[in-house]
Amino acid sequence: KKKMNKNIIITVLLISNAIYAECSDLNQSDCDYWSAYCQWNSEQNICEETGGGGGNIEYGPYEFALLTETDGMPSSPFYNGALLFYPTNATPPFRSVIFIPAFGEAYGLEAWAEFVASHGYIGMTIGNYEGTEEDYWDYESRAVGLMAAREIIKEENERINSPLFSVVDTSNFIFSGHSTSGGGAHVAATLDSTINAVMLLNPAVAFVDSLNCPAETEYYCLIPEHLDHNVPTLVYAGETEYEELVSPDDDIYSNMWARPQYDYIPETTDKLWFESAGMGHGSAEQPVGAAAGHAL
């Protein structure tokens, strides 16, 4: 992983000529309404699928294969299923990047896991518990899930019949997540200083703090003291996501998004800000364009 310089602010202009049928017929207001799937490209005045301004994923030089729990990889009660991609023709030992999507099953960030595997990393993506599966699944639950996945990868390094037997760099792990699960990755950084880095994809986070947070938010909030950690951090954001997510009169949840998180990380911690111009909350959900290249 390239070393991240401190306090660099990068605004990237992402322009795409690709028009996607399922989003391109929408006007801006409808595009914003369907922001889970589409995003407005203000440079070209068109609606596109989420994921770095359109375009195709540019995979790296390595072939990769899939490992799942049906292949003998252990499961964990701390997350809801997993997909693990590993390079088949790269030189070990392999560093690992573990992803978790905002909601739903592991497939949500499958493209990111495949992308890093094609560049010589182990890429694992894990699923969330939802609804009746878990009564209490929050940011810390996601953090625990990421840490549990790390232990599963270490176990695979010891399992004789695993394709990862003796090829894992067991001292090098990066955690990543999108939106609320980016928040989970950030919580993990506050819990475990041995994490090598966190890569936060349009993150949202709040901490339970009965001393400093108001009762009307069930004592969830975000203040600088919550993010006092030394784990190198890459924060992705879309230029327009704050306006999409926060109303002008919102003084409760206004500081849980990407920019406040970046600002609250101590100046002594290596941190990097990456903003995609004209894009919203899905700007880094897929490994496309400059956002993908900057992750390497």
Please provide the spans of the model-predicted regions.
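Sec-dependent N-terminal signal peptides
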Residues: N7-N17
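Extracellular Cys-Trp
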Residues: D25, D30-S42, I46-E49
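N-terminal cap/lid segment of alpha/beta-hydrolase-fold proteins
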Residues: G52-P92
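Gly/Ser-rich "nucleophile elbow"/oxyanion-hole loop immediately N-terminal to the catalytic nucleophile
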Residues: P92, W137-G183
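Short beta-strand element of the alpha/beta-hydrolase
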Residues: P92-A102
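Short amphipathic alpha-helix adjacent to the substrate-entry channel of hydrolases
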Residues: G108-G127
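Short glycine-enriched nucleophile-adjacent loop
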Residues: G182-D192
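The feature captures the conserved acid-bearing segment of alpha/beta-hydrolase catalytic domains
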Residues: N196-H281
